[in-house]
A protein has these predicted regions:
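Hydrophobic, aromatic-enriched alpha-helical segments typical of multi-pass transmembrane helices
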Residues: 1-283
C-alpha cells in the first residue's frame, strides 16, 4: 500500500463518528431504500478504510500486529454498526419499539466489542512495558463493560416486551428509571478507562504528547459534565434547553463514550499497518 491511501483512510476513519451521528440524527432520512443505501455505502467505506489502514494485519501480520489490528477493529465496531443501522433513526423517544430493539442490540454488541478491544490493548501495552496505567484502565473497562451489559440487556428486554405485548409493564417503567444510574456509571467508567489508556499509550510513545493530553482532557471534561448532569433530571423533556445543547446529557448518551475509543482504534490500526522498522510516535 502506498502512503497516500493509508493517510486518506486515517482521515476518513477519524471523521466516521461525526458522519455516523450526522446521518443518524435526522429522522427524515428513515425512508425505506434511502437509509439502507446510505448505511451500506458508509459500512463498505469504513471496512475498506480500516483494511487499508491496518486491519489486514489480523490475517497476515506478526502476533503483535495481529493483536493491535484486532483491538483496533473491535474499537471501531460501535460506529461501524451505527453507520450501517442507525441512518435516520433519531433519538429513542421518536422511534418505534421495533427500531429501539435494533438500537439497543447494536449498543449491546458495541459495548462487548469495546470491552474486548480494551482487553487486547492492555495485553499489547503490557508487552510494550507499560503496566501501571493500563492495569487501572483495564479495571475500569471491565466494570464499565459489566454495567453496560446489564443496562443494555434490560433495555433490550424492555423493548422486546413492548413489541410483543404492545407496551411494557408499569413495573419495567419504574425499573428503567432506577437503571439510568447504571448507565451513568457505565459511561463515566468508559471515559475514565479511555483517558487512562490514552495516558498509557503516551508513556510507550504510541501517542504523541499533544494527542495524549487532548484525549485525557476530553474524557475528563466529558466525565465532569456527566457528573454534573447526573445531579439534575435526566429527562430531556424536563428542560427548556434542547437535549443536544446540554453537554451533560449528551455525555450520557450510551454511544457517545465510544467516540474516543473509536479514535484510539484508528491509532492502533495505523500502528498495526506500519512496517516493522517503524518505531516512532504514530499519532
Amino acid at each position: 500500500m502506498t502512503y497516500t491511501p493509508r493517510r486518506v483512510s486515517k482521515v476518513f476513519l477519524c471523521s466516521v463518528p461525526i458522519l455516523a451521528i450526522g446521518f443518524a440524527a435526522p429522522r427524515a432520512l428513515r425512508v425505506a431504500g434511502v437509509y439502507h443505501t446510505i448505511g451500506g455505502v458508509l459500512f463498505v467505506a469504513i471496512v475498506a478504510a480500516a483494511w487499508i489502514l491496518g486491519a489486514r494485519s489480523i490475517r497476515s501480520g506478526r502476533e503483535s500486529e495481529q493483536r493491535l489490528a484486532l483491538a483496533g477493529a473491535l474499537l471501531l465496531t460501535p460506529f461501524t454498526l451505527v453507520a450501517l443501522f442507525w441512518v435516520g433513526l433519531g433519538p429513542p423517544w421518536e422511534t418505534t419499539p421495533p427500531e429501539n430493539v435494533m438500537r439497543y442490540l447494536v449498543l449491546l454488541v458495541s459495548s462487548i466489542a469495546v470491552t474486548g478491544g480494551f482487553v487486547l490493548l492492555k495485553d499489547a501495552l503490557s508487552d510494550a512495558g507499560e503496566r501501571n496505567y493500563s492495569t487501572l484502565a483495564l479495571a475500569a473497562t471491565i466494570l464499565a463493560g459489566a454495567a453496560y451489559l446489564i443496562w443494555m440487556s434490560f433495555m433490550l428486554g424492555y423493548y422486546v416486551v413492548a413489541v410483543r405485548d404492545g407496551k411494557a409493564p408499569a413495573a419495567m417503567n419504574s425499573l428503567a428509571e432506577v437503571f439510568d444510574i447504571l448507565l451513568d456509571v457505565a459511561c463515566l467508567l468508559t471515559y475514565l478507562a479511555t483517558a487512562t489508556f490514552a495516558a498509557s499509550l503516551g508513556r510507550v510513545r504510541w501517542l504523541g504528547r499533544g494527542a495524549t493530553r487532548v484525549y485525557v482532557a476530553v474524557n475528563l471534561i466529558a466525565s465532569f459534565c456527566l457528573l454534573m448532569s447526573s445531579m439534575s433530571s435526566p429527562d430531556p423533556a424536563a428542560h427548556s434547553t434542547p437535549w443536544y445543547a446540554r453537554p451533560g446529557f449528551v455525555a450520557g448518551i450510551p454511544a457517545i463514550p465510544f467516540i474516543m475509543p473509536f479514535l484510539l482504534g484508528v491509532v492502533l490500526l495505523r500502528r498495526a499497518g506500519e512496517k516493522p522498522s517503524t518505531n516512532g510516535v504514530l499519532y
